[in-house]
């Protein structure tokens, strides 16, 4: 394998590095449109930090700098890297491609060395970030939360403010499956009531593609917060429930689908983080006398279609806002799968229960 591919792969991995906590990849097959307009069906693995995919017959693929999913191979050091062969569904492979994949090992993953190098980079950032930790959402009582609907300056939204108000607050939402509020009322045994104020759709200053790289995700959130202040007239002081000078948590919906279910590198991967970790000063984050810091961000749509996002991802990310960690395969040692609490746990695979996450599992007792 050509040596020039190694630094590109390092950039690929580190581009995903945040000290955030996010959702694991959707377990459902994803239909991804390659830049040549051919459709490839893949299974996405991993999380917002490091992710890869496999074809339905088990060959590992990576998304290269041109937006193509190509077959992954091992270099002379045993590290996972890109080939120059564009991946296709099994039934659409040319004879050249068939000959190539017949020589490949299935279900390749990043080497231990790659993962250690990656984790060391993340842990260093994490230690720096957590020194500025500014708190989270109350775990009991009746509390207010803000949801900001953020549209890019080159996209059109599908669902309305009223739709998301129902999604967050309506008793028996989605034919009795329940809203976000219903979910947390149930799993807290009536001890946590979250009343969410949903803004109008506000428009951020850049196109969707600008915010695609992980280094821009927090910028999207900050731009949405500023837009909520100027375009929607939000009074942020209403969302400091314990009067400590901090907004306890903000949920930001972005137009379109999330990368965890689209496999598209131009989409934001749902996650929970803090604007202070991204370098925004207290002055920049102060609105109406309170400071904005902790946030979650989730998609408007499930995958690349037109179906509204389900509550599973939102409930998982809010779990981080309450202080819960991830319980899926966060060290990538089992190819993105973790039997553990699995489908029984909101903070593991249980956020995807039901149809694409419309009936998420309760969180574990952590």
State where each predicted segment sits.
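Short, charged/polar micro-motifs that form catalytic or ligand-binding hotspots
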Residues: 12, 137-138, 242, 308-312, ...
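Bacterial N-terminal signal peptides
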Residues: 8-17
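Bacterial N-terminal signal peptides that target proteins for export
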Residues: 1-8
